[in-house]
Curated annotation (Swiss-Prot):
Residues 383-402 have a biased composition (Basic residues). Pfam families: IQ (PF00612). Its main location: nucleus. Residues 199-212 have a biased composition (Polar residues). It is found in: Nucleus. This is Protein IQ-DOMAIN 33.
Length: 442
């Protein structure tokens, strides 16, 4: 009502005070004022009707004050005609005021009735719920004077405000309850998270058993796709770096493009060469490892530590004196064989010592067998059966060892012939002696 009401008043309400020179114009414009009042009530509707009668009364009082002022002026300046005009003007003004008030009341009645009907239909639900409050308010209104009683429009506004307050409170209550329910559900989910994870694992295994495919297959596919994308991005970034390099040369675009392409090709060739060299290094290292393993296996193919100990071990029945003689003979043979294999020691660390050591063992075994035969012939009645059994067993073991030793010696001879040359011998006599010994041992 604020601005629009002021505009309506400024347009439709005219000053009700007329001077002496406007007397005839005032009477001629009565019909126009009536028309304006009807138009005003039709157009302005609620805004005009909402203007209270207080404003009208104030305007009427202003007009009366102006009329009194005009009468005083006419009396002071000695204008009797003006006084008559003023009286007639006051009568006409009062008549117009009565007509305006009647039109305003009729317009208010016509406008407020449909508005009240429409709003009452929309607010039946609120009125039904608050019948008790309305009855109480009506009971109190009987005691309230007419000046303080509220209009039906203000009552509707109060009811709407109360409904808004009630709805806001109810919505806040619903929001609080919803938040509490969400917190409770979240706590329950956290408490049962362990059981759900086990259920998920069992479901995954059951799916694998039913379909025959692993559940992680799409995960690996995604990994492959991501790896391919990364390689493509790396290649693209390298090309972009080459292109982004500042080129100060005054060369055509075709030549610059050919240069960039040549750089890319050179880079790819370099990468291929590095990859090939790395693969060759891996192959060489793997071959070396295989050779080392094979050599270790070949060295382990020979006798075990127990067999070697049994071969070098002398039987318990041999006296002490012949043992010392055997040791001196073995030492002399080993010295001669070492003098023979000085040139071959440069190639291998201990390849020549083992077979020669076996040769010395074979010779000692012959001597040991002769000694045993003499002892048996001389001490037949004195030796018991229990002591004689292990001696025969030891002889059988020695014969078996000799057979295996002979095979190994033949293999070592072949290897020596393939590796060493006849220049390895210092003197012909030593070579003949060693060859004669080898033949005698075989």
């Amino acid at each position: 009502m604020g601005v629009t009401g002021g505009l309506v008043r400024s347009i439709f309400f005219r000053n009700k005070s007329f001077g002496a020179h406007d007397y005839n114009n005032g009477r001629g414009n009565l019909g126009e004022k009536k028309r304006w009042s009807s138009v005003r009530s039709y157009l302005c509707g609620d805004e005009f009707n909402s203007v209270r009668a207080v404003n009208d009364s104030e305007s009427i009082k202003d007009s009366e004050a102006l009329l009194t002022m005009s009468q005083q002026l006419s009396s002071e300046f000695g204008m009797p005609f003006g006084s008559v005009i003023a009286i007639e003007d006051s009568a006409s003004v009062r008549h117009l005021e009565d007509e305006d008030s009647g039109s305003v009341k009729s317009s208010e009645a016509t406008v407020t009735q449909p508005l009240l009907e429409e709003k009452s239909k929309g607010l039946d639900c609120y009125l039904k719920e608050e019948d008790v409050e309305d009855n109480q308010s009506e009971a109190t209104e009987t005691h309230i004077p007419k000046k303080h009683q509220t209009t039906p429009i203000s009552k509707l506004f109060l009811e709407e405000d109360a409904a808004v307050i009630i709805q806001s409170a109810f919505r806040s209550y619903l929001a609080i309850r919803r938040s509490k329910e969400e917190e409770e559900t979240f706590a329950k989910e956290e408490s049962f998270s362990g059981e759900e994870s086990q259920d998920n694992a069992s479901m995954g295994t059951s799916l694998e058993a039913q379909t025959g495919n692993s559940v992680k297959a799409p995960f690996f596919r995604r990994k492959r796709v991501s790896a391919n994308r990364r390689t493509l991005q790396k290649n693209n970034t390298q090309v972009l770096r080459i292109k982004e390099d500042w080129d100060d040369s005054t060369v055509s675009s075709t030549i610059s493009k050919s240069r960039i392409q040549s750089r890319v090709e050179a880079m790819t060739k370099r990468e291929r060469a590095l990859a090939y060299a790395f693969s060759q290094q891996l192959r060489i290292c793997s071959k070396k490892k295989q050779i080392d393993r094979s050599s270790e296996d070949d060295s382990n193919i020979g006798w075990s530590w127990l067999e070697r100990w049994m071969a070098t071990r002398v039987p318990d029945s041999i006296p002490i004196e012949p043992r010392t003689d055997v040791a001196t003979k073995n030492q002399s043979l080993i010295r001669k064989n070492r003098a023979f294999g000085t040139a071959g020691e440069l190639e291998s660390c201990a390849s020549n010592d083992l077979p020669l050591h076996f040769e010395s063992i074979s010779e000692t075994q012959g001597d040991a067998t002769t000694v045993l035969q003499t002892e048996k012939s001389s001490f037949k009645p004195s030796i018991s059966k229990r002591k004689s059994v292990p001696s025969y067993k030891s002889q059988r073991k020695h014969h078996k060892l000799q057979a295996t030793k002979s095979d190994l010696q033949q293999q070592t001879k072949k290897a020596k012939k393939a590796k060493t040359t006849p220049t390895s011998c210092k003197t012909g006599n030593e070579c003949e002696e060693t060859s004669h010994k080898l033949n005698s041992s075989t």
